[in-house]
Amino acid sequence: MQYIVAYDFGTTGVKTCLFSIDGGIRMEASAYAPYGLYILPDGGAEQDAGEWWAAMCSTTRAAFEKTSVRPEQVTGISFCSQMQGMVLVDEHANALRRPMSYMDQRAGAEFRACQTHGLTISGVNAGMMLRSLAATHAASTSVKDPLWKYKWVQAHEPEIFQEAHKWLDVKESLIARATG
């Protein structure tokens, strides 16, 4: 029998499921653990990468304890998560500061300085939007987008910005930590 562990990292907790995958897909066990969402008075919304990791570890143990499945029987791991977060990490994938949630709205000034001048479409610079759409099929049109969080850290926490090796989203930071 082969098994997959699936993690779903939501805004306030993780659900971990253990599936058997021989001859179909069947959920064998699941577990849930909450973690914090820290709303700051300046529009910030942060989480704690250590809390994500602790919740992942505890729910993994709990799911396995509900079955006779052994970890070596797991042939795959899947992650899905909230999007548009920002986790600044060092070379070892350690978070340098609390991750900024998709709900964080502190970067209004950085967004406006770059996006709201010249000809605009829905408040966003038309030329920048069209170039971005042509190159990536996406455009950063909200203060909540990770680009503006990155620019906010650059302006307000330059020492952390200088230490950052990579900028990752939620699930990518957890994959990096889990895989080294």
Where are each of the predicted segments found?
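N-terminal glycine/serine-rich phosphate-binding loop of ATP-dependent small-molecule kinases
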Residues: 1-98, 109
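Glycine-rich phosphate-binding/catalytic subdomain of phosphoryl-transfer
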Residues: 61-180
